[in-house]
Design a protein with these regions (language model features):
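Short hydrophobic alpha-helices and adjacent helix-cap/hinge residues
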Residues: 1-131
Length: 131
């Protein structure tokens, strides 16, 4: 059965996905995931399991790809809010913002290690391709 699977910390269960052809993992946008990034990337590399994350750093460090908000853009937008607050605006009067700039990073080194090919048309959509 395909779909979500609960996290299981036992070593033999870590590679359960690797035995299921066509499976992969999507990392949640969560501080725990970021803090355990090294162990997660090591586990998926050893198990040859594709991983997609919302964090650019994951793709740089070895996941298959990342797609998520552009962190630099978020920090720039946050700085403008800090500036407005320091100039006297009340934080409660500022509108809520959501990310509006997203980036796709594809790691071809990982793709090759996993034996996966990625279409050129998809690579053309990427903001960054790691070769």
């Amino acid at each position: 059965m395909r779909g979500e699977r609960p996290c299981n910390r036992t070593a033999e269960k870590r590679y359960e996905l690797a035995r299921d052809p066509g499976s992969g993992l999507i990392a949640a946008g969560d501080p725990f995931i970021v803090n355990t990034r090294e162990a997660i990337l090591k586990t998926v590399a050893e198990g040859k399991v594709p991983l997609v994350s919302p964090y650019r750093q994951f793709a740089i460090e070895g996941s298959l790809m990342s797609y998520g908000p552009d962190s630099a853009d978020i920090f720039r937008r946050s700085a403008s809010y800090v500036d407005r607050i320091l100039k006297g605006e009340l934080p409660g009067n500022l509108p809520t913002q959501s990310p509006d700039k997203f980036e796709l990073v594809v790691n071809l080194k990982t793709s090759k290690a996993l034996g996966l090919s990625i279409r050129e048309s998809f690579l053309l959509l990427a903001d960054e391709v790691i070769e």
